[in-house]
Amino acid sequence: MLKFFLPFLLIILFLLTLFIIWRINARKYVTSDTVASAYDAWTQDKLLERLWGEHIHLGFYPTRKKYIDFRKAKVQFVHELVKWSGLDKLPKGSRILDVGCGIGGSSRILAKYYGFNVTGITISPAQVKRARELTPSGLNCNFQVMDALDLKFEDGSFDAIWSVEAGAHMNDKAKFVDEMLRNLRPGGYLALADWNSRDLRAYPPSFLEKLVLKQLLEQWVHPNFISINDFSNILRINKNSAGKVISENWNSYTNPSWYESIIEGIRRPYSILSLGPAAIVKSIREIPTIILMNWSFRKGLMEFGVYKCRG
């Protein structure tokens, strides 16, 4: 009896240990400094880049395609958002601001394939350093450390504003929108993608959903989530907006990214193993949050919103 009970007990203890590590090392949002610290750590330990590549965002999976490489899907996402938002109508040399640029993946595509002059900003000094390292000389990209809630550019400095999965880290969504649209020239383009919750006033979360949302907020430095409709309204009523906002839910295109991000560690085990035991623990530690994200987006508790409007 003992020989059957002991392995079971060891498994329980292992899972309990992982749960304790997961909870103790939660990354709760306190101020924007906690966002900067989290992304500094994620960049410096190299694990996220090894697994996700140069793009720290979800991929785009056309519904008729059975399989697309995880990293290629991320590149595809950038091109799809460019086309959907109308940025491809802008002439070469147009000035683009990439808000929450990460390590510069989107910025480099916008510069290389569309001929744009791109400025990327992120609150993480480590991300700026890495973005500069990854950017070939001669490519029209520059990267700066800057808070998206306090942009240091003159009004109307850019022909387009681009932002992917940054807004969920902003505690003041209206200020986030105001800063972006203030820096957009009249008639310019805004292209934005972000993680949203469903409308929790119209469809209140169950007890289980509340627990899940709490973990999604606390694990990856998110102060709050709002619905696609609420964010669209913030864009619509802003004094610098032309007023017409188009939004869509891209859950069906992006959902495969979640389980693909786990499978990626199996496809490229050396990318984790080469970083040592600490990286293995860190990668395992993220799996529960990814599973909860996958569940939330598939159940409709969370929604992947894309937005476009003009200045």
Region annotations inferred by a language model:
Residues A160-D172:
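A short SAM/SAH-binding and catalytic strip from SAM-dependent methyltransferases
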Residues R95-L97, I103-D150:
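Class I SAM-dependent methyltransferase SAM/SAH-binding core
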Residues F4-E49:
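N-terminal auxiliary segments of SAM/dcSAM-dependent transferases
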Residues L149-I161:
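A short acidic, Gly/Pro-enriched loop at the edge of an enzyme's catalytic core
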Residues L192-D194:
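Acidic carboxylate diad motif detector
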Residues A174-Y189:
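A short glycine-rich, Lys/Arg-flanked "PGG" loop and its adjoining helix->strand segment in the class I
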